[in-house]
Amino acid sequence: MKKAIMGKKIGMTQIFNEAGKVIPVTVVEAGPCVVVQKKTVEKDGYEAIQVGFGDIREKLVNKPAKGHFEKAGVVLKRTLKEFRLEDVSQYEVGQEIKADVFEIGDKIDVSGVSKGKGFQGVIKRWNQQRGPMTHGSKFKRAPGSMGASSDPSRTFKNKRMPGHMGCVNTTVMNLEVVKVIAEKNLLLIKGGIPGPNKGTVVIRNAVKA
């Protein structure tokens, strides 16, 4: 069965397993999320649920969004996300989805917006090799050749060059849930996940597990 939830990245720490081995984990406050809309094949052509996460002040929400939440009879939420499922009959509008939908040992994919790094050169952005740092070298961290001269007289599209780095949607796949603290809606996930602390992340079943 497909499972999905939104959450807030708290930060990283470490725990010990039964053998005394250190496991680096990311703590995520997963939910509670609320079902705002339920879509069916008969009405919408596909099955999905629309889920809201995170509180927001009323003055920051526009009229169409307010009407959408009022129709569902739920409080205003900061983030809306739609999850496609095979069967939405087990969900109802207004129902809460909490961290206990996942269990210890579940394989998951975590998506989020990566940390922004600003304008970066080709060495940091694309892991290119630098030039010699001594003996009169005139290129140390420079990009090098961007293409031929008279033919084709242009730089090809998708040439790796300096530019804005980070702040893009990123997914880390096949992570493992090592602990679930249901009463606090916390998931402890083995390894690192995208984005800064307090950033919103989406947790789904692993598609390649």
UniProtKB/Swiss-Prot annotation:
A Gene Ontology molecular function term of the record: rRNA binding
Q: Name one GO cellular component term.
A: cytosolic large ribosomal subunit
| UniProt region (Disordered), positions on chain | 130-162
One GO term under biological process is: translation
Q: What domain of life does the native source organism fall in?
A: Bacteria
Q: List UniProt keywords, sorted A-Z.
A: Ribonucleoprotein, Ribosomal protein, RNA-binding, rRNA-binding
Keyword Protein transport in the entry? The reply is: no
| InterPro entries attached to this UniProt entry | Ribosomal_uL3, Ribosomal_uL3_bac/org-type, Ribosomal_uL3_CS, Transl_B-barrel_sf
Keyword Cytoplasm on this protein?
Answer: no
- PANTHER family, per the entry: 50S RIBOSOMAL PROTEIN L3 (PTHR11229), LARGE RIBOSOMAL SUBUNIT PROTEIN UL3C (PTHR11229:SF16)
Describe its partners and assembly state.
Answer: Part of the 50S ribosomal subunit. Forms a cluster with proteins L14 and L19.
What is the recorded function of this protein according to its Swiss-Prot or TrEMBL entry? One of the primary rRNA binding proteins, it binds directly near the 3'-end of the 23S rRNA, where it nucleates assembly of the 50S subunit.
Family in the record: Belongs to the universal ribosomal protein uL3 family.
Q: HAMAP family, alphabetically?
A: Ribosomal_uL3_B (MF_01325_B)
The name this protein goes by in its record: Large ribosomal subunit protein uL3
Species whose genome carries this gene = Clostridium botulinum (strain Eklund 17B / Type B)
